Amino acid sequence: MKRWLGMLTLALVACSGPGPYGYARTYRPIAGEEAATRNAKAFDSAMLTEPGRFADVPLNIFGVVRQRGSASTKGHVYLTLSVRRLDDRNLCASANDERTCRLTVSDVSFGEVAVLIELSPEDDEGEHAVGPGSLLRIIGVLGSDFDSVGGGPIVHGTWYRHWPRGQFVTRAQATELRQ
């Protein structure tokens, strides 16, 4: 009986957290995220004009996937991201229920960036795979290689977090999610 109650309590605590998509009023990092982002500098599209200055600087980028290219021979995928800003507070459908909150980013793009990153198997294929409309937080460095379409340097991702379509919102949805 005690064992069963302990397992039930653990299950309830596990279910009440923000989960992998951060259902909370403010941004909640996942395991390993704080370490991955510790020395990262917030991305500014002006960095693409001076890649030499930022070649060894870890960059922190939030972006909505516009295009997903094919995988390279090393298992990395090529992504084009529309750069967004993270809001200080997430939008929620109910002030009393954090489970109705969704990570919120700007509805305006602050430029585009090309990224090469290795995805986990769960994010590479299947229902919630990274693709157009997904949101990613990328930590990476500017490479010495350049995007053949946009012309800018390619960001080589070292860490990422993924929100599939429908698991985040933009400021444009503030009229629907008022809390």
Protein language model features and the residues they cover:
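Sec-dependent bacterial lipoprotein signal peptides
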Residues: 1-15
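OB-fold and OB-like single-stranded nucleic-acid-recognition modules
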Residues: 15-179
